[in-house]
């Protein structure tokens, strides 16, 4: 209950007050709220793709292998035409990224909370260095590069919370809401060789690796 509340509240003092005054029922009452940043879940590392597959699915069942982009983690909240953008640390960067606000506003859903990354690409479609992406999101003034969003998870769509669904269910909702141009490249497989080949192709595109 504490971990869930910590993820959803976006505020440690709010969690502490709820725990002191209402105990577990008060913590359980925290839920997704449009416009309130959600603490992201962070991945752990593995030395090889094969080991990551085994860790994710010891029984050998298929798992999702996704491109890991070397950009800024970005959470997008859409409520009608109102869009807010939050970083990994829950800083509100809405005013700094008008091109991403426009992209999220264009989605054919009434409301959504999406998790993804944003990064800058060069003319050939390869990613710029992380520091270039970071500097392009750091201020409201003149920016050297525009950023492009890519999403890999949906936490809520059209008023429905998805956080208790398995990843496969959340991804189905994401695909229905987000056009392919804004989706992180992905492979579902139980084959270690296929996963390794996919990882090599992602690295060849200039990205950081894969997430399993």
Language model: regions and residue ranges:
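N-terminal nucleic-acid-engaging modules of covalent nucleotidyltransferase systems
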Residues: 1-150, 154-188
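Metal-assisted phosphate- and nucleotidyl-transfer catalytic regions
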Residues: 177-212
